[in-house]
Amino acid sequence: MTRFIIVTLFISLLTAGPDRPYHTTPDREKDMIHMLIDIEVDIQEGRISGSVSHTFTPFSSDCKRVSFDSDRIEIHGVSIKGQALTFQQNGPKLFVNLDKSYGWEDTITVKINYTSHPTMGFYFVRPDSSYPNKQLQGWTQGEDTDNHFWVPMHDYPNDKMTWECRLTVDESLSAISNGELVSVTDNAEQRTFHWRENVPNVSYLLSVAVGDYKKIEDEWDGIPVNYWVYQDHDRNDALRSFGKTPAMLEFFSDVTGVRYPFEKYDQTIIEDFMWGGMENVTNTHQTDRTMHEDDVRPIHSSDGLVAHELAHMWFGDYLTTRNWPNVWLNEGFATYLELLWTEHETDPELAEYERLGNLGATVWADKSYRRPTVQHYYYNSIELFDSNIYAKGSVIINMIRRYLGDDGFFRGLKQYTRTHAANNVETTDLKKVFEVTTGKNLDWFFEQWVYKPGVPEITANYRYNRRSQLVSLTLKQTQDVESTSLFKLPMVVVIDDGNINRYNIFFDKVEDTFTFPAEMEPLMVGVDEGFQIPKRLTFEKKTDELLYQLKNAPVPNDRIWAARALKETRSTKKIHSALVEMLSAEPKWYVRREIVNTYQSLKPRNGAADLMAAYDGQDDRVKRAIISALREYETDDVKSFLLDVIENEQNDYLVSSALYALIKIDLDAAKEKFDWAMEQESHSETI
């Protein structure tokens, strides 16, 4: 499930502390083998009707009663081989009294006939008088535990099974589900689609998507790859959003050491989706907002979303968390493989910049609602889907990589995927594989980063001794070690004394001083080069060193740190001139965007002219930052500039940003554009 979380689920529903109930993996009374769903989907009535048959073996030698998760579902009857069984419904549970006592060696199939009008788990989209152009759709969203609101089932990720779906829908619609399409049968004004998933998986990954779809076919290495889009989309539209999928399949198969393990890979767009995407096994649901025209690139791209959801086919689907407290194993790996794709396909330094964003989200989450990554205390498991599993999860995996090195990390990653293929996993499984593969004891690492909350708070300062030609770097950990940890921190210190010198240190004390040789007083000293570790760093530097670092640090993330640090300095012409110079000299667009943000925060008197002069030739993402910065300057020149952007730029997001800026500086001028703006068709109605 993608990380488009609304204010991180209201800051994880404010807190996630030990005052909440403790949760661990629930016991199982039976081992699920197969599930056969045979239903009619009535979108207009919002109704599911039919049956589900569960095949399982008991764990006990005297099994007389079994239960299924079933909430607000009308049960018409339960049977074994046509023989009716008695049953009771109690809250979210359906209890079934078996016809006799069964043992662990028996295989049982229980059939449940039912009707549901679900308000969760299965959603219906219909056109109405307010939105006459809406699609007619029905689709599922099972994660975390919502599928049992529309079909009785075992609804927890500690068991895997195969399943089939026979879906009867209106003859004008298609019904897509997991696995292979076995058959399509035409009935009177209806069609029945029979799908079968042959690889055992957890029930929240069950997918049903019903709608008026067009299938765009693709393939990778003999595996069908399909894009289910709307009738007004063509092949180019589908490929614009999803066309890199085959290359991603190739890359992820290589990096995990496991060839894509399922029958096919479909991506189905849906309307009114509450998330960005959902990694239902072999049939990912994607928000239809990801469809776009070329004009909105690079501000909008589907690549990250597509990579994230596809990565889940290995981490989340093939290997699935055994319980919700360990769900970071799903989301952290998917988020990190998204970065690996950027590193592989685009630019390793851009991937590092994206990782810097995850690092920032990790620190923000810790400040807002401190909790460990593996969290057993919660009211509802959906509370856990926050930055601690997505952003921090990916940061943890990156730190493992940096500590073990690429060779050890990628060998361990492949061994982890192969060892636990098609199984459930917990954090201990990952830790053990990396320890066995590399010989490293990782107790300390997982204890401080996974099982305990918090991030280090570090103050840094240094002195240079000209006589000894030594730099003395003093580091202090200032966090409350009682509530978090005294962190063990392997880091790289970079010193520029006319030459770039890097030194590996291991900082594991409250305070420590490290010395390094330097032939002259350093032009720049950096702690944790590239910012690999989530932390709050206080490192006061003189303006000249910050400007030098902005221009000369070899790693873009360190140049970004300098740009951000300059926001806290006194605004001077020297700084303004340096920032303007770097808007053209800096090679990376993402560093230039940070420079624009710094320039805006310093509010130079002639800032508008400098920003407008720097606009042409910039990456659209930098242009958008410039437009946003111009909101601070209410002048006729800026108004004319914004009107020119509105009338001539092709990227919807630039036009939208210019309109918002114009509202702030000249509301009357913006009102004159209102009718025009309302008539524009734009991506996600951004204009």
What are these regions (language model features)?
Residues N113-Y213, E217:
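Extended, low-hydrophobicity, Ser/Thr/Pro/Gly-biased non-transmembrane segments
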Residues M1-R3, V52, W195, N226-L475, ...:
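Hydrophobic alpha-helical and helix-loop surface patches within well-folded domains
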Residues D71-Y131, K509-E521:
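A surface-exposed beta-strand-loop module
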Residues R47-D71:
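Ligand-binding face of N-terminal immunoglobulin V-set domains in extracellular IgSF glycoproteins
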Residues L13-S49, N133-Q137, P157, G439-Q448:
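N-terminal, polar/Ser/Thr-rich
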Residues C63-A84, S172, P490-G498:
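Solvent-exposed beta-hairpin/edge-strand motifs
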Residues V169, A311, D407, H420-A609, ...:
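Non-catalytic accessory/interaction domains
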